[in-house]
Every structure is written in C-alpha cells, then in structure tokens.
Amino acid sequence: MKNLIAELLLKLAQKEEESKELVAQVEALEIIVTAMLRNMAQNEQEMLIRQVEGALEGVKPDASVPDHDTELLRQYVKKLLRHPRH
C-alpha cells in the first residue's frame, strides 16, 4: 500500500512539473505576442488580427474536442490579440 501511495505521489509531482512548464511556455508566448504587437504600426496590427481571426473561423475542430474547449481557445486568442497584457 505504501508503494502505491509513493508511486501516486511521484506521478502527481511529475504532472505538476509538466503543468508548470506549460504555464511558463504560455506566459512566454504571451509576452512575445504582446511585444510584437506593440512594435507594429496600428494598420499592421489590425491586418494581423484580422488574418488570425479569419484563420480561426476557417478551422473546424476535431469532433473529439468539446465545444467549450474550442470556445475557450477562441476567447483567449481574441483577448490576447485585442487586449494584450501590459
């Protein structure tokens, strides 16, 4: 029983580490996108935003992806492009 608990704790720690790495990657990408947008002229920003939004509209998610997840992604992309972090 102790071995099972130890094994589960180890797996949990590994998952937590993977989660931290993913959060760091997402935050790094947010910083990069924000910096890129800030260094673009307003008309270039708008053109890029329209292209990204248009590309998202044309994408049909796999049937196994829940609608909620798809909508969450769309909202996050919109927030990142239209309201970048400061």
Curated annotation (Swiss-Prot):
Entry coiled-coil feature ranges: 1-36
Q: Name one Pfam family in it.
A: Anti-adapt_IraP
| Name assigned to this protein | Anti-adapter protein IraP
Q: Which GO terms describe its biological process?
A: cellular response to starvation
Output the Gene Ontology cellular-component terms: cytoplasm
Q: What does this protein do?
A: Inhibits RpoS proteolysis by regulating RssB activity, thereby increasing the stability of the sigma stress factor RpoS especially during phosphate and magnesium starvation, but also in stationary phase and during nitrogen starvation. Its effect on RpoS stability is due to its interaction with RssB, which probably blocks the interaction of RssB with RpoS, and the consequent delivery of the RssB-RpoS complex to the ClpXP protein degradation pathway.
What triggers expression? Answer: By phosphate starvation and limiting magnesium, via the transcriptional regulator PhoP and the alarmone ppGpp.
Q: Which UniProt keywords apply?
A: Coiled coil, Cytoplasm, Stress response
Family of the protein in this entry? Belongs to the IraP family.
Q: Which domain of life is it from?
A: Bacteria
Q: Does the keyword field hold Membrane?
A: no
User: Self-association or partners: how does it assemble?
Assistant: Interacts with RssB.
